[in-house]
């Protein structure tokens, strides 16, 4: 170690990220965290999905990368809504030159949308900070029909709680090794109000909704942003209930200090590595 360095400063999450599996890569997560938040370039196949260093498009940011399980994929966008066309349409180009990958923190610029996305987490809550350009139609896509590795999203449910909160669940379809479908419950909070909650289903935009339920669809809250506006988003998960997801969020992340969570995550990683 050089003077002033800590073990956590030497961690390189990108090692073996060109040809690993969807559940190997770890960046914006805690040691043994239930949330394992990171970008996904590949979506299908046991060896062709998750964070793939040499692939050129980020499809979404998923909160679960586990053996036979994934889920709760999101992506911020600007301009024309392409959520109903799938991740191959709404995904974004990026450059490793504008990416920072560390233990407990991941930042990358989505070139198609000129959005800087920063990710960190607590054990059960993914924490996002998005820096937007000026746009009359900024959005955050929650795709409840996405595939990652062998784990596809069978269906989902979302309810608008307020103009800053939504809740729901994703039903992850069974796999060869996980013979039953699994519900992933979530609670999502924003630090700023969204103007409306919209939905998509079966390749079509449905317009504004208060609730969504079904297959092959999802939702996207929309915002108007000015240059440099920062939107913070918390995504808590539970395998028990929506109420438990809300409890996890309020217990683990009652504040909006993103930098403090990054620092706390790094300290926890350093403790494990020391």
Where are these regions (language model features)?
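Accessory carbohydrate-recognition regions in carbohydrate-active enzymes
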Residues: 5-274
């Amino acid at each position: 170690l050089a003077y002033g360095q800590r073990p956590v400063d030497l961690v390189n999450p990108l090692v073996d990220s060109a040809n690993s599996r969807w559940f190997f890569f770890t960046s914006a997560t805690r040691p043994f965290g239930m949330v394992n938040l990171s970008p996904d370039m590949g979506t299908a196949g046991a060896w062709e999905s998750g964070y793939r260093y040499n692939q050129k498009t980020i499809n979404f940011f998923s909160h679960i990368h586990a053996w036979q399980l994934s889920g709760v994929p999101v992506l911020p966008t600007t301009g024309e809504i392409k959520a109903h066309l799938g991740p191959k349409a709404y995904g974004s180009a990026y450059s490793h030159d504008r990416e920072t990958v560390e233990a407990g923190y991941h930042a990358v610029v989505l070139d198609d949308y000129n959005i800087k996305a920063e990710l960190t987490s607590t054990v059960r809550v993914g924490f996002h900070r998005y820096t937007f350009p000026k746009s009359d139609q900024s959005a955050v896509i929650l795709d409840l029909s996405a595939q990652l590795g062998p784990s596809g999203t069978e269906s989902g449910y979302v309810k608008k709680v307020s103009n800053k909160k939504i809740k729901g669940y994703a039903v992850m379809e069974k796999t060869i090794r996980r013979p039953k479908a699994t519900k992933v419950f979530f609670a999502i909070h924003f630090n700023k109000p969204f103007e409306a909650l919209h939905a998509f289903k079966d390749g079509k935009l449905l317009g504004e909704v208060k609730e969504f339920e079904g297959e092959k669809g999802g939702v996207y809250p929309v915002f108007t942003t000015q240059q440099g506006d920062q939107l913070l988003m918390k995504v808590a998960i539970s395998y028990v209930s929506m109420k438990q997801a809300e409890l996890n969020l309020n217990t683990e992340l009652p504040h909006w200090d993103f930098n403090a969570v990054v620092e706390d995550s790094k300290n926890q990683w350093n403790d494990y590595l020391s």
